């Protein structure tokens, strides 16, 4: 297998395609103009297409992924707001676009050829709509509303519609600002990173009602740190034993060891990393973590210890200007 890395460059209005080798060296395969400022990217469930959200003309572009990982432009569709996060349901038929500045979430159908079709539904008045995450059963979409300190849950139907009258509200503490979400399938838990507070909330998901119950809050900032936080991204390792969280004030990635007993879940360490680490990616085998620095204009590759979950820096490479999103693909 080979690992391909996709990085969006907001200021350059480009996407870079890199190949990661077994010795952790990389080579640049391709650089493509995106005809606008690229923001979120996501790979289709069948690994055949890459979707990129751009602004100021709000669109989602699809690119065909060739056998070597390089891209060819395929199609595009208009979005109702500036995209900042994408999610795809488990069937691979529907793309959810969160818009923080336009306070909405939209649904774009994806046809069998990977073409994004016109938006079929827009949910408005989700203030600070930052990200979404589908539950294990493809029946409920969780959506973060950063400006409201809230996570919403909407029932999702097989016809690709969210039922607005089923919305449930789950509040964080005031001025926490829930941002990105991830799901731990083995324990049916939702994890949310709080941008303004520098912490992670751990939620239990009721398998029948999709109600969230807050189990624990974990601080990710340095000991005795008491200033403003600016936390951004989080990802659970494929083995579901470790959680990684980035913060853009301290320029760190924190490592949290996950346990079945929530009382035993704790932060086990952190590393200094790129300047302003807005997003990062863990490959599907759980062997490496790659983080981009929005201010450092570079990205770093870390080897993940499968025993301890700790990170070992293996390489750093320069990118174009303002890398804001990264995704990894095993081919």
From Swiss-Prot:
Its EC number is 3.1.1.31. Pathway: Carbohydrate degradation; pentose phosphate pathway; D-ribulose 5-phosphate from D-glucose 6-phosphate (oxidative stage): step 2/3. This is 6-phosphogluconolactonase. Keywords: Carbohydrate metabolism, Glucose metabolism, Hydrolase. GO terms for biological process: glucose metabolic process; pentose-phosphate shunt, oxidative branch. The gene is pgl. Catalyzes the hydrolysis of 6-phosphogluconolactone to 6-phosphogluconate. Coiled coil: none annotated. Pfam families: Lactonase. The lineage of its organism: Bacteria, Pseudomonadati, Pseudomonadota, Gammaproteobacteria, Enterobacterales. It comes from the Bacteria. GO terms for cellular component: cytosol. HAMAP family: 6P_gluconolactonase (MF_01605). GO terms for molecular function: 6-phosphogluconolactonase activity. It catalyses: 6-phospho-D-glucono-1,5-lactone + H2O = 6-phospho-D-gluconate + H(+). Belongs to the cycloisomerase 2 family.
